[in-house]
Regions:
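Glycine-rich active-site loops that engage anionic ligands at enzyme catalytic sites
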Residues: 18, 22-129
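Eukaryote-biased recognition of intrinsically disordered, low-complexity regulatory segments
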Residues: 1-16
Length: 129
């Protein structure tokens, strides 16, 4: 199942469109959808954006230690949603490495330079399209 959601950055008048895909982490995607809308702060770690703790409860589900550009994931260790725009401080050349394993839940499908604008504790709302 694929489902569109959006991450709204009201401060910058920008929205990031995300296509959730439950093919790798169906329980996690279901938990995300059941908890929308979520209003939370988002932070920056290298070229990764990640939320503060969310009400989403999900354990590792086919968790990955390496992700692809524009992946969206859930980080069970931090109860956080992560958007990968590029490398993190622990990435290796040509590989995007999260802080610890993440459940892949979808992809960023809109083009935006939001990564350049976000500072730690930027407020966002994650909601259905």
């Amino acid at each position: 199942m694929k489902k569109l959601i959006k991450v709204v950055f009201s401060e910058f008048n920008e929205t990031v469109s995300v296509e959730l895909d439950d093919s790798q982490s169906p329980k996690t995607v279901k938990a995300i959808l059941e908890n929308l809308p979520i209003e939370v702060n988002i932070n920056k770690w290298g070229q990764e954006l990640y939320t503060d703790r969310t009400p989403i409860a999900a354990r590792e589900e086919n968790a990955k230690s390496e992700v692809s550009l524009m992946d969206v994931a859930f980080w069970p260790a931090g109860n956080a949603v992560c958007l990968f725009y590029g490398s993190t401080p622990i990435s290796k050349v040509g590989k995007i490495v999260p802080a610890s394993p993440v459940n892949i839940v979808g992809r960023i499908i809109s083009q935006t330079n939001i990564i350049d604008k976000v500072k730690d504790t930027t407020r966002v709302v994650i909601k259905q399209e």
